[in-house]
UniProtKB/Swiss-Prot annotation:
The keyword NAD does not apply. Methylates ribosomal protein L11. GO terms for biological process: methylation. NCBIfam families: prmA. HAMAP family: Methyltr_PrmA. This is Ribosomal protein L11 methyltransferase. It comes from Thermosynechococcus vestitus (strain NIES-2133 / IAM M-273 / BP-1). One of its GO terms (cellular component) is cytoplasm. The lineage of its organism: Bacteria, Bacillati, Cyanobacteriota, Cyanophyceae, Acaryochloridales. Its main location: cytoplasm. Pfam families: PrmA (PF06325). It is found in: Cytoplasm. Disulfide bonds: none annotated. Its EC number is 2.1.1.-. It catalyses: L-lysyl-[protein] + 3 S-adenosyl-L-methionine = N(6),N(6),N(6)-trimethyl-L-lysyl-[protein] + 3 S-adenosyl-L-homocysteine + 3 H(+).
């Protein structure tokens, strides 16, 4: 019997994309597609028909509108319909093509070949039901920050271990290994993210002893790391900051994104309280990435 899914479509301002992603993920949506249409984004998420009712979907619409309007954005539009599993599993792939990021990386869908003249490091990716295709500003900011932290232009990179907290599809952890890190931890509270990360590691020829994947959060990082990357929403970053001294070496670096511009000061203040010094803030549209260094244990 063919399983049927609710296809939930949200049209909103591009700046509200991450908020909608987070709400869809919290609701239980397992796959997403994003299209840009005349300055607005169309985001589609999918959830099994038997898991939710029409009343649940109506409530989701209310939550999304509250989230988006509270940040000062225009009211989003919500539409839903029933589709067969095979239909949604393949339809969104048509909208995703190889994407160059930074100076050295190319994100390439697993079902496509990179350009013949490509000279970049290729990250093969099939996000499946997890979040993270590399198209969003916050992901690209994190990838560019990883390029900076793992740069080997002037001297070889010493053995480096990183942790990707909230790994989604595993794109950031995988990129760090391709850029020269020796080992990476990838953790996420979603079992779908764990599965997607493991699959993407195989696609990129990464061994299980290079990429340690666990379901959970920071507590699953079993050694002190040289750097940590967190591309998650600001409230979650603030929640886990007090725990990071347990896993980050003194003078270790941190890349923090998923942060709206008007949230940056609040996150920066919490970083300072937890013993981090802020090096730079990178901005792209309404999103930013904070690059920091861990200086001391908090008082």
């Amino acid at each position: 019997m063919v399983q049927r899914w609710w296809e939930i479509t949200v049209t909103c301002q591009a700046e509200a994309e991450e908020l909608v992603y987070w709400r869809l993920q919290s609701f239980g949506c397992q796959g997403t597609a994003t299209q840009l249409q005349q300055g607005r984004v169309l985001i589609q998420g999918y959830v099994p028909q038997q898991r939710v009712s029409l009343l649940d979907i109506a409530a989701l619409g209310v939550w999304i509108e509250q989230d988006v309007v509270a940040q000062g954005y225009l009211s989003p539009k919500l539409h839903w319909q029933l589709v067969n599993e095979q239909d949604w599993a393949h339809s969104w792939q048509a909208y995703w093509h190889p994407i160059p990021v930074g100076d050295r990386l190319l994100i390439c869908p697993a079902w496509e070949m990179p350009p013949l003249d490509n000279t970049r490091l290729v990250i093969k990716l099939d996000p499946g039901m997890a979040f993270g295709t590399g198209t969003h500003e916050t992901t690209q900011l994190c990838l560019e920050a990883l390029e900076m932290q793992l740069d080997q232009t002037f001297e070889p990179l010493p053995p480096t271990v990183i942790a990707d907290i909230g790994c989604g599809s595993g794109i950031l952890a995988i990129a760090s290994l391709l850029l020269g890190a020796q080992k990476a931890y990838a953790v996420d509270t979603s079992d779908l993210a764990v599965t997607a990360t493991q699959r993407n590691a195989e696609l990129n020829g990464i061994r299980a002893d290079q990429l340690i994947v666990h379901q959970g959060s920071w507590e699953q990082v079993l050694e002190l790391v040289d750097g940590v990357v967190c591309n998650i929403l600001a409230p979650v970053i603030i929640e886990i900051l007090p725990h990071l001294p347990a896993i980050v070496k003194p003078k270790g670096w941190g890349i923090f994104s998923g942060i709206l511009l008007d949230q940056a000061d609040r996150v920066a203040e919490q970083l300072k309280r937890q013993g981090w010094s802020l090096g730079s803030v990178w901005r792209r549209n309404e999103w930013c990435c904070l690059n920091a260094r861990f200086e001391r244990l908090p008082d």
